[in-house]
Regions:
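Glycine-rich FAD pyrophosphate-binding loop
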Residues: 28-48
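Flavin (FAD/FMN) cofactor-binding and adjacent substrate-gating region
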Residues: 94-164, 169-170, 176-183, 188, ...
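Core beta-strand elements of the Rossmann-like FAD/NAD(P) dinucleotide-binding domain
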Residues: 7-9, 194-204
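N-terminal Rossmann-like FAD-binding beta1-loop-alpha1 element of flavoenzymes
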Residues: 11-35
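C-terminal catalytic lobe of FAD-dependent flavoproteins
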Residues: 150, 160, 225-232, 240, ...
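Dinucleotide-binding Rossmann-like beta1-alpha1 core, especially the glycine-rich loop
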Residues: 52-125, 129, 255, 397-404, ...
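Flavin (primarily FAD) binding-site architecture
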Residues: 207-221
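Short hydrophobic core segments
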Residues: 14, 200-210
Length: 542
């Protein structure tokens, strides 16, 4: 095994989710030298495995006023700085005949106290503005919910961090912490692409690894007690609702239907699991049944809608040090300065929270880093727009007005003001790779050159290749060829990655493999094995 020379920086961030990316951006904007390490790809943990809800905070108003206030504040900030990552759909909290209508008044009052706009509307009006809603509803409240693309949001933060000097090392797994006495001064990493190992040095290391943060802390012989909660979701094959639809009751299973990009999602379940199971993302038949049964109560059209795939993620719920049983685990933001907590300097853990509050979590963590380094520059991430959101979409669309509407619309929706740099180029760049999501060859090249793409799976999260109705059936081979053309992969690697990509798609389809989904999967298998000669896929563990 080869060992590379060490690198030095001011701060090392472990974890490539939204929080880690946000910390990298904040630190870089404050003039710090930053290295971020992620064992897989960006947004492969809880960040990329949630429902993409741009919380207004209304969901938490009754049960957690502090979280509700944080959410509405960050909601308003993201609508300013991340316009190309969010869609202000608004949301409806509906009351069904089986629910307690009197809860609506409690709900509205709690929203008002948290600073959240909540307007009771007539059920008939709710049916007009959201035709998919259950017509049997007896009450509705309109709130400023929306949707956010977690992959796009994370990539934009990473891109801004890189453009301000940060080094982003994906496919690099932390194998240990480097210590000098009672101080952490770096990490040891292994590059999964080359097998090389390397020592990275910095006076501050930030553990932003989410649920895996407990394992990272153990490298320093520290104990962070986490209680993993698995949440499962289903994706519809098209967008069936235009507003976020919630049940007006205390949070429960399968009570949010979220429209996002070209699809809708129903979620989530909540199941405590053993820590040893955090990498097992299988969705069970029982969870699928719950999601379908409860989801149809929100929008009856779900009963006639094809389910595209299922997936799950694990929330990092943190117990306080004096609560070993986990009876009172927190869903709030948890910031641990291990110098104060454990007598170990140079090491900080940021965990808990939610996608909605990633920027606030990053601000807290970066403030802690700067205190240690004597850096007095203020946080500016609430005011500075992310790459892609630095001009209105209408202005960007006018710059590419001569191009076909589906291409320019989809590209600007995903990449905002960065689109004209590549979409207006030659004929090849405008050629379609993925018809379902209108992804072009130019978009693939842009992602390769700017967004840390090392594989087909990486490309999926940057461009939505393979995330449409065909689940890669018609576009995966084209995308694999382009990655080879753009010198990301060799011929042998392209074939291996194609097989890996299709197997990953199947893992999400398998829990709902009936009817059209099963027929399409069989057709995909025939195309790649029978027609293209791809070797039989590795036997799936499912």
């Amino acid at each position: 095994m080869k060992t590379r020379d060490s690198q030095s920086s001011d701060v090392i961030i472990i974890g490539g989710g939204a929080t880690g990316a946000g910390i990298a951006r904040d630190c870089a904007l404050r003039g710090l030298r930053v290295i971020l390490v992620e064992r897989h790809d960006i947004a492969t943990g809880a960040t990329g495995r949630n429902h993409g809800l741009l919380h207004s905070g209304a969901r938490y108003a009754v049960t957690d006023a502090e979280s509700a206030r944080e959410c509405i504040s960050e909601n308003q900030i993201l609508k300013r700085i991340a316009r190309h990552c969010v869609e202000p759909t608004n949301g409806l909290f509906i009351t069904l005949p089986e629910d307690d209508l009197s809860f609506q008044a409690t709900f509205i009052r709690a929203c008002e106290e948290a600073g959240i706009s909540a307007e009771a509307i007539d059920p008939q009006q709710a049916r007009i503005i959201e035709p998919a809603v259950n017509p049997a509803l007896i009450g509705a409240v309109k709130v400023p919910d929306g949707t956010v693309d977690p992959f796009r949001l994370t990539a934009a933060n990473m891109l801004d961090a890189k453009e301000h000097g940060a080094v982003i090392l994906t496919a690099h797994e932390v194998t240990g912490l480097i210590r000098e006495g009672a101080t952490v001064c770096g990490v040891r990493v292994r590059n999964h692409l080359t097998g090389e190992t390397q020592a990275l040095h910095a006076p501050v290391v930030v553990n932003a690894a989410g649920i895996w943060g407990q394992h990272i802390a153990e490298y320093a012989d520290l104990r962070i007690r986490m209680f993993p909660a698995k949440g499962s979701l289903l994706i519809m094959d098209h967008r069936i609702n235009q507003h976020v639809i919630n049940r007006c009751r205390k949070p429960s299973d399968a009570d949010i239907l979220v429209p996002g990009d070209t699809i809708s999602l129903i979620g989530t379940t909540s199941l405590r699991i053993d820590y040893n199971e955090i990498d097992d993302n299988r969705v069970t038949a029982e969870e699928v049944d719950i999601l379908l049964r409860e989801g149809e109560k929100l929008a009856p059209v779900m009963a006639k809608t094809r389910i595209l795939r299922a997936y799950s993620g694990v929330r990092p719920l943190v117990a306080s040090d004096d609560d070993p049983s986990g009876r009172n685990v927190s869903r709030g933001i948890v910031l641990l300065d291990h110098a104060e907590r454990d007598g170990l300097d140079g090491f900080i853990t940021i965990t808990g929270g939610k996608l909605m509050t990633y920027r606030l979590m990053a601000e807290w963590a970066t403030d802690a880093v700067c205190r240690k380094l004597g850096n007095t520059r203020p946080c500016t991430t609430a005011d500075l727009a992310l790459p892609g959101s630095q001009e209105p979409a209408e202005v960007t669309l006018r710059k590419v007005i001569s191009l076909p509407a589906p291409l320019r619309g989809s590209a600007v929706y995903r990449h905002g003001d960065r689109t004209p740099a590549w979409l207006s180029e030659g004929r090849l760049h405008r050629s379609l790779v993925c018809e379902c999501e209108a992804v072009t060859a130019g978009e693939v090249q842009y992602a390769v050159e700017n967004l840390n793409v090392n594989s087909l799976l990486d490309l999926r999260s940057r461009t939505r290749v393979g995330m449409g109705t065909c689940q890669g059936e018609l576009c995966a081979c084209r995308a694999a060829g382009l990655l080879q053309r753009f010198n990301v992969t060799t011929s042998a690697q392209s074939i291996e990655q194609l097989s890996t990509f299709l197997n990953e798609r199947w893992k999400g389809v398998q829990p709902i493999a009936w009817g059209d989904a099963l027929r399409e999967s069989e057709f995909t298998r025939w195309v790649y094995q029978g027609l293209c000669g791809l070797e039989k896929e590795q036997k799936d563990a499912l």
